[in-house]
Each structure stands twice: as structure tokens, then as C-alpha cells.
Amino acid sequence: MFVNLYGPTEITCNCTYHILNPERDYAAGIPIGIPFPNEDVFLLDGENRKITEPETVGELCVRGTALALGYYRNPEQNAAHFVQNPLNPNYPERIYRTGDLARYDEAGLLVFSGRKDFQIKYMGHRIELEEIEREMAAIDGVERCCCLFDEKRSRLKGFYVGTVEKETLHAAMRRKLPEYMIPGILRQVETMP
């Protein structure tokens, strides 16, 4: 049996798990799964509202018995990450804001979506470049890839090493991603550092 575990150090190890099913296709990624019984794991949007609908990305937050007391002699980081639960105004209850982004899939399993501090804002949407790269990398014929945001020109650029034609790659990405997440420029390159 293989199990995918997720958990930052601040939770003193793991807070979610997913038992891999050998019959399932994990081409789109392996979920981080469901919380352990002693943890409550949930997603918050930018307005501190709980996210429950599938495919909506939010910050992964944790509360429970394994939550650390905080960072040693680092009050700034404590104030940013070990905070009062915004969903509970009735009594003191600390949560840990991981800075990780996640979403629920259609089966209700958590799926890691990247880091909050690598987000950009483009066409009115918050975008995780890693998410675009993950979808691009899953397309047949793509060996390596990266996505960059050109702030000066305000556009997304995708670079890839592989055998797939640009038009085929663009069409495949349009089937997997919303229009605002499709790089305006796709460039095939020989090598990538």
C-alpha cells in the first residue's frame, strides 16, 4: 500500500493523507486527500470565507491537536500564520495558515495547487503559475516546461521542451484551463535549465 502524506512542520508532521488506488489514473496529480481524525483542514478564500465547492482554490488552513505553539522568538511570523480562526468569532481558537494553496476535486479530496506567495494577478484573477505548468507538463509530448508572467507587457508566456506542436499544445491547454490561464505566447525551446 502506498500513501501520499501532506503536512507542514508546524503541524508536527502530517495532517492529510490519500491511500493510492492502483486502478486510478493519477496523470492529473495525486491528491493530498483527507484530514487525519485529530486535524481539521479547510480552505479559506481571500475574504476569509470557507471554500467547499470543487475546483475553487484557497489557502489551506489547519487546526487540531498537533498544531505547534508558534515559531521560536519570531512574533512577526506567528502573527501572520498562527491566527484566530476567522470562522469562529465566539472563543479563542488558533489555526495555522500554511501559505499553501489547494482545492477540492469532484470526489471531495484535497489537491495541492501551489504556494500563495507565487501568485500573480492577471485579468482580474489570482493565478498560480505552478498550476499552469502542471497542466502543461501533463500534456503528451511535453518533456519540460515553465510559465512566466511578463509584468511589463502584462501577459503570460509559456516555454516548453518537447515534440508537441504549438497549436496542439494550445488546443490541449484550452480544454484543461480557463481562458485567462492560457499563455498568450507559447515557445518551443531546445533545452531548459
Residue spans of the language-model regions?
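AMP-dependent adenylate-forming
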Residues: 2-4, 19-193
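Short catalytic/ligand-binding loop motif for oxyanion handling, primarily in non-cytosolic enzymes
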Residues: 11-14, 154-156
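Adenylate-forming
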Residues: 3-11
